[in-house]
Every structure is written in structure tokens, then in C-alpha cells.
């Protein structure tokens, strides 16, 4: 026989589980797959999803030239979260024509988080999280210049990418521009009409360090 003389209320302390959106794989406790764009063929790296789909469990839903929607372990649309420089992007979840509207220009690496710890990023990250890490500022005292030119014979198109970055004292800066001009896609039966596309983009940033 069990009896209880007094009613006792036990209140447990609240537990809060958080994770910063700007935390990269080097500081994370999560299982993360990482792709460094330094090791990717520039032709493949032209389109972000072409590169990310090389990672295990990641594929691309493609409905036409330049359109690629991420799919992680079969889940996509509003089941995949994309974070660029700590900011959630809300431009690819809806229709199948809404691809990942991010160029690989100026991107240093991409990290993909999969598994049950997606709950740290919210219920809409059930498929996983794609974290995009931009190229780092340089600590060199002078300006650094790089250029990449690509010719696509199938589209009879060109891509020109120019980057400038440098540092002076505690101040660092970066600038990158890219221009893409592709014609209609060529198939064995001839050109496919209305598959041409153009893209112009500009990225810039400035950083000031209080200690250096």
C-alpha cells in the first residue's frame, strides 16, 4: 500500500537549446559535409547546385538551364533551409521553377547539415541545412586580383569573373563582379529556343578589425 500525505509541486528549470546561424563546420558539433570551391572545376562551379549535388545525399531538381532546387535525402522545397552569411534565404521553397538563386561567385565553401539535429534550425529544416560561406578577406597589405574566363560551346556563351581584394592596417575590403551571356542550348536536333540567359552580379564588402 502506497500513500502520500502532502502534495508536492516540483518545478523543473527551463532548458533552452540554441545554435548560432553563423557557426561554421570548424566550430560546430554537428555532422556536416563540406565542399570547398577551390577543389571544384570552374565549369562545374558556375552553377551552385551543380557543385552541391556532388555531396552525399544531395541532389538537384532541375527544370531548365540555370534552375536547380536543392533536395537532401529526398526532401526539398520548404523542408530545406538555406543560410547565406548568417541570413536565411526564402527564395527557393515554393514552386519547382524557383531554383537556388545564388551564384558560386565569391563563395569559398558550402556546408550541408543532415540528420536529427536539424531541429536546431527549425521544423522547416527537416531535410537539412545548406550553409554558404563567402570568401574570406585577405590580410595582405596590397591588392590581390584574380580573373576567370569560361567559354561554353554548347551555349556559345561566355562567363567573365573578376575579383579584387586587399587590406590596409585594420581595414580590409573585397570586390567581385561576374557577367554571363549564354545563347540558346544546342541539341542534336538543333537549337532549343528560349533557353538563353544572361546574368550580371556584383558583390562587395568591407571589414574593420579593432585588433590586428
Q: What are these regions, as identified by a protein language model?
A:
Residues 12-41:
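N-terminal periplasmic "start-of-domain" segments of outer-membrane beta-barrel proteins
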Residues 14, 69, 109, 129, ...:
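Membrane-embedded beta-strand positions in outer-membrane beta-barrel channels/transporters
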Residues 43, 47, 67, 97, ...:
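Transmembrane beta-barrel architecture of outer-membrane proteins
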Residues 49-88, 108:
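Extracytoplasmic beta-strand/coil segments of soluble accessory domains associated
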Residues 71, 87-116:
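Short acidic/polar hinge/loop motifs at secondary-structure boundaries
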Residues 102-146:
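A beta-strand signature from Gram-negative outer-membrane beta-barrel systems
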Residues 131, 139-142, 163-212:
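Periplasmic-side early beta-strands and strand-to-turn transitions of outer-membrane beta-barrels
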Amino acid at each position: 500500500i502506497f500513500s502520500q500525505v502532502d502534495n508536492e509541486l516540483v518545478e523543473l528549470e527551463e532548458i533552452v537549446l540554441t545554435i548560432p546561424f553563423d557557426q561554421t563546420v570548424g566550430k560546430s558539433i554537428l555532422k556536416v559535409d563540406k565542399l570547398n570551391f577551390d577543389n571544384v572545376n570552374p565549369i562545374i562551379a558556375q552553377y551552385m547546385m551543380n557543385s552541391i549535388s556532388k555531396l552525399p545525399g544531395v541532389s538537384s531538381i532541375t527544370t531548365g538551364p540555370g534552375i536547380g532546387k536543392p533536395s537532401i535525402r529526398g526532401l526539398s522545397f520548404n523542408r530545406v533551409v538555406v543560410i547565406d552569411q548568417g541570413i536565411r534565404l526564402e527564395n527557393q521553397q515554393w514552386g519547382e521553377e524557383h531554383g537556388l538563386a545564388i551564384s558560386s561567385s565569391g563563395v569559398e565553401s558550402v556546408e550541408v547539415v543532415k540528420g536529427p539535429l536539424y531541429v536546431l534550425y527549425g521544423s522547416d529544416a527537416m531535410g537539412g541545412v545548406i550553409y554558404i560561406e563567402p570568401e574570406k578577406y585577405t590580410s595582405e597589405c596590397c591588392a590581390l586580383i584574380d580573373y576567370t574566363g569560361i567559354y561554353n560551346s554548347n551555349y556559345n556563351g561566355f562567363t567573365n569573373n573578376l575579383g579584387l581584394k586587399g587590406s590596409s592596417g585594420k581595414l580590409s575590403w573585397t570586390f567581385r563582379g561576374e557577367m554571363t551571356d549564354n545563347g540558346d542550348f544546342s541539341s542534336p536536333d538543333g537549337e532549343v529556343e528560349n533557353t538563353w540567359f544572361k546574368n550580371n552580379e556584383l558583390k562587395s564588402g568591407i571589414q574593420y578589425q579593432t585588433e590586428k
